[in-house]
UniProtKB/Swiss-Prot annotation:
Protein source organism: Aspergillus aculeatus (strain ATCC 16872 / CBS 172.66 / WB 5094)
Cofactor requirements of the protein: heme
Source taxonomy: Eukaryota, Fungi, Dikarya, Ascomycota, Pezizomycotina
GO molecular function: heme binding; iron ion binding; monooxygenase activity; oxidoreductase activity, acting on paired donors, with incorporation or reduction of molecular oxygen
Protein name: Cytochrome P450 monooxygenase AacuE
Predominant cellular place of this UniProt entry's protein: membrane
Transmembrane segments: 4-26
Gene: AacuE
Domain of life: Eukaryota
């Protein structure tokens, strides 16, 4: 009995000590913006994750300066708003976006610790990850991958003819294609060309995309199925890419040579361990947003026939201008379009893509102030202290009616030269990143979307419908600005009808 009581006392004491530890609030710089009352003991301002835009609006409205402080577990975060603060947030060289991943519970990378591939050990402070991602998007490399990725796109849309209903949610079909092309552009043809391995890769990436462990920010030691699934996802990708790298290292001199990304990196003497880490991270990044956006763009064009017709005319014009035989079937002409044309000659797709990103990829961006000193917030005597996270919600600028009149309406023309109301403010559009951290994968992302839409529209006419194929002209944005992640119009269905002239 005495032993039982002693054990109970020890357990209760340990539990109370843990509660005291969790409830301890570290001191912060006195010039930090005022803390929001929207907080929960131990956890902090959890609405930052669960009610993203409502939380942000409420905090800004209650702040005299538009800036505010809040806790996420033990982490101090400063939310900033307005054009001047946005510019500092995006331009300050001490604001580290990679370490901002500490507060993001998605994907195969767990921060901290920060893997060596993300350390700025190269020229101009670039990391191995940044250096190789840029290298793989140089014209020489993308030119080598172009025949493969166009073949992937053509094959994916030709396969749709096997479905008699002609009804689909294009996000599902496009995701497999995006993963296949990503494997080819940032990893290995061995994955892209093997249906079984490609299916495994797609399955693991899908698991990671639909798993979030943001609760671990506040309670890092709490057992979590989500964290376990994320680690399992990282292990799953490692099991796919590691054997490929190892086989190449052990390959005999007279064996057939692969000309893909794995071989490119090995030929440059890259560390096999760093290569595997790079492939794991990049495959997830290259598939995540593109997997959603490509399907979403088909949804959008199906419900906007005027833009679909406009883009189709551009496709025919570009194909005829570059095809050896302008009288060949349109899909055959597409097979011969050079890289520079894929990149530069589809202005209507670019307008539609920017508007889709503006409306459906709006979220709080996070940076960590790595400077040994506080960073002043313009127009105030407030600061972002050293070692503190800063956050800016891109919804603020992307749905600002002064920059985007009638912001809830899909209107690609707002990005056309001669309008561009968003240029009234510096960094009025942040969809591709801005300042110190533009999107490093932007070049490939644009080329990839142009290729996918070109083959989709060359082969089929698309129209909106319900799940049973009944025509529908009502375009429901299905955008929840408070959602934990970007909310895209992926719940819509499309009907596709083969064109008479393909």
């Amino acid at each position: 009995m005495k032993a039982a009581i002693t054990g109970l006392v020890a357990t209760v004491t340990t539990f109370l000590a843990y509660i005291v530890f969790l409830s301890y609030t570290p001191r912060v710089d006195k010039k930090s913006p005022q803390f929001t009352p929207n907080t929960v003991p131990l956890v902090g301002s959890w609405s930052f994750f669960t009610q993203k835009w409502a939380f942000w609006q409420d905090c800004v409205a209650k702040s005299q300066t538009g800036h505010f402080s809040f806790w996420l577990g033990k982490y101090h975060v400063v939310g900033v708003s307005g054009a001047a603060a946005r510019k500092v947030f995006l331009d300050n060289p001490n604001f580290d976006f990679v370490r901002g991943a500490t507060l993001v519970g998605h994907g195969p990378d767990f921060v901290p610790p920060l893997h060596a591939i993300f350390h700025g050990n190269f020229q101009n402070g670039r990391s191995y990850f940044q250096r190789r991602l840029v290298d793989l998007q140089k014209s020489e490399q993308l030119g080598k991958r172009l025949p493969g990725v166009t073949r992937d796109a053509r094959g994916a849309f030709e396969a749709l003819r096997q479905h008699a209903s002609g009804v689909m949610n294009p996000t599902d079909a496009c995701y497999r294609l995006v993963v296949q092309q990503a494997c080819r552009v940032v990893c290995s043809d061995e994955i892209a060309d093997d249906p079984a391995v490609l299916a495994r890769t797609q399955s693991v990436l899908s698991l990671l995309m639909h798993t979030s462990s943001i609760h671990a920010v506040a309670l890092p030691y709490l057992p979590s199925l989500a964290k376990l699934k994320r680690r399992w996802g990282r292990y799953g990708l490692s099991r796919i890419v590691t054997p490929i790298v190892q086989r190449r290292l052990q390959k005999k001199k007279d064996a057939p040579r692969h000309d893909d990304v794995v071989q490119y990196m090995l030929d440059r003497g890259d560390s096999p361990e760093w290569m595997v880490a790079f492939f794991i991270s990049t495959l997830f990044i290259a598939s995540a947003n593109a997997g959603y956006l490509s399907g979403a763009m088909l949804n959008i064009l199906a419900y906007h026939p005027d833009w679909q017709a406009r883009i189709y005319r551009e496709i025919k014009t570009v194909a005829a201008a570059h095809a050896p035989n302008p009288h060949a079937p349109l899909v055959d002409q597409l097979d011969t379009i050079p890289l520079d044309a894929w990149e530069s000659f589809f202005p209507s797709i670019d307008l539609c893509f920017k508007e889709a990103i503006r409306m459906w990829v709006a979220f709080p961006m996070i940076r960590l102030n790595m400077a040994p000193h506080a960073v002043p917030i313009p127009g105030t005597d407030e600061v972002v202290p050293a070692g503190t996270f800063a956050s800016y919600n891109s919804t603020e600028v992307h749905f600002n009616p002064e920059l985007y009149p009638d912001p809830y309406r899909y209107d690609p023309e707002r990005f056309r030269e001669g309008r561009e109301e968003f240029k009234k403010e510096v960094y009025g559009f942040v969809g591709w990143g801005q300042g110190r951290h533009p999107c490093l994968g932007m070049r490939w992302a644009k080329i990839q979307l142009n290729i996918i839409l070109a083959y989709a529209l060359a082969m089929y006419e698309w129209s909106g419908c319900d799940e049973k194929g009944q025509p529908s002209t009502h375009f429901d944005r299905k955008t929840d600005l408070n959602a934990p992640g970007p909310s895209l119009p992926v719940g819509l269905f499309c009907k596709y009808v083969p064109r008479k002239e393909v």
